[in-house]
Swiss-Prot record:
The keyword Transferase applies. The lineage of its organism: Bacteria, Pseudomonadati, Pseudomonadota, Alphaproteobacteria, Hyphomicrobiales. The gene is rsmH. SUPFAM superfamilies: Putative methyltransferase TM0872, insert domain, S-adenosyl-L-methionine-dependent methyltransferases. GO terms for biological process: rRNA base methylation. It comes from Methylorubrum extorquens (strain PA1). Specifically methylates the N4 position of cytidine in position 1402 (C1402) of 16S rRNA. Its EC number is 2.1.1.199. Keywords: Cytoplasm, Methyltransferase, rRNA processing, S-adenosyl-L-methionine, Transferase. It is found in: Cytoplasm. S-adenosyl-L-methionine binds at G48, G49, Y50, D67, F94, D115, Q122. The keyword Metal-binding does not apply. This is Ribosomal RNA small subunit methyltransferase H.
Length: 351
């Protein structure tokens, strides 16, 4: 994908927010094409990297930034002050972004950006319980509400744990890990990230020469389940579709194959490349109005230079689309299915 020229930048004081350079930033800005006054919605504020770039793209770009994490909202206070009234921070889930911006008297938006998954800020804070590289409480909740990872690990049935690890974490040894978890918790509750990481490492052997920690996939699966991340992504795509004006653009950055599959199927169906099935008429595929046209013809990947500087970007993919004037069709049942645990179907190829 060719990179669009940068628009005039409205510089913000460097002290307004700790600098955080998000993944594929130049490519996201090019895909959005912020070439006019309007409202941008950053559905995943985090450390504020995309929001800062949106504000700097032009002096007449206004931003509503959303995050379910109250810590992120508090951390953005200086950036709000520096924005001169152009930034509003809203605590909530991006799956409700249409309702959240309507509550701000903004029924429509010109641009929406979603950066899916856990933020670097959350990973780096041991007390949040996301990282297997730092010991902390086994939490993983982005917003602090609902059951924690410790609740799942110590309370779910073995078969459910195995399904979570396999389908959300893509862990091939999911049954063995789930069995080890159940055996360990009979002796004592599993309460810290180090306990769980060590337990998984005793079951999943690292591949020779691989930099991937043996607990990576298990932690991913639990985190996705705790935060309903795939369900939130599905709701966010449909919410963005409802709020975008004709000509408005949606850019989505994903970090693993499950997320990317959902985004790919959404844009494929909504652009007319695939038939659409609705939950309201299950099993029936039919032509539907094309609510998006593709901006990116395939996934945009980070450059080698970016992955050298930021190894966490290596799995990132960007997809983007431009809203047409067609009304938003009913939600897609196909991507709703991808976001859920499938019904049990025998033992399959996992161990």
């Amino acid at each position: 994908m060719s990179r669009a020229p940068r628009t005039a930048r409205a510089e913000l004081p460097k002290g307004a927010q700790a600098r955080h350079v998000p993944v594929l930033l130049a490519e996201v800005l090019a895909a959005l094409s912020l070439d006019r006054p309007g409202l941008a919605v950053d559905g995943t504020f985090g450390a504020g990297g995309y929001t800062r770039a949106l504000l700097e793209a032009g002096p007449e770009v206004r931003v509503i930034a959303i995050d379910r994490d109250p810590t992120a909202i508090r951390g953005g206070a200086d950036l709000v002050t520096a924005s001169g009234g152009r930034l509003r921070l809203v605590q909530g889930r991006f799956g409700d972004l249409d309702t959240l911006i309507a509550d701000q008297d903004e029924p429509q938006a010109d641009w929406v950006v979603l950066d899916i998954g856990v933020s670097s800020m959350q990973i780096d804070e041991a007390q949040r319980g996301f990282s297997f590289r730092q010991d902390g409480p086994l939490d993983m909740r982005m917003g602090g509400e609902g059951p924690s990872a410790a609740d799942l690990v110590n309370g779910e049935e073995e078969t459910t744990l195995a399904d979570i690890l396999y389908h959300f974490g893509e862990e091939r040894r999911s049954r063995a890990v789930a069995r080890a978890i159940v055996e360990a918790r009979r002796r004592a509750p599993i309460e810290t990230t180090a306990q769980l990481a060590d337990l998984v490492a005793g079951v999943v052997r690292p591949e020779p020469g691989s930099p991937i920690h043996p607990a990576t996939r298990s932690f991913q699966g639990l985190r996705i389940a705790v935060n309903d991340e795939l369900g939130e992504l599905v709701r966010g795509l449909h919410a963005a579709e409802r709020v975008l004006k004709p000509g408005g653009r949606l850019a989505v950055v994903t970090f693993h194959s499950l997320e990317d599959r959902i985004v790919k199927q959404f844009f494929s169906a909504r652009s007319g490349r695939a038939a659409q099935a609705s939950r309201h008429v299950p099993g029936v595929e039919r032509p539907a109005p094309k609510s998006f046209k593709l901006v990116t013809k395939g996934p945009v990947l980070p450059s080698e230079a970016e992955t050298d500087v930021n190894p966490r970007s290596r799995s990132a993919k960007l997809r983007a689309g431009e809203r047409t004037d067609a009304p938003a069709p009913p939600p897609l049942s196909a991507i709703e299915t991808l976001a859920s645990l499938p019904a049990p179907q025998g033992r399959g190829p996992r161990r």
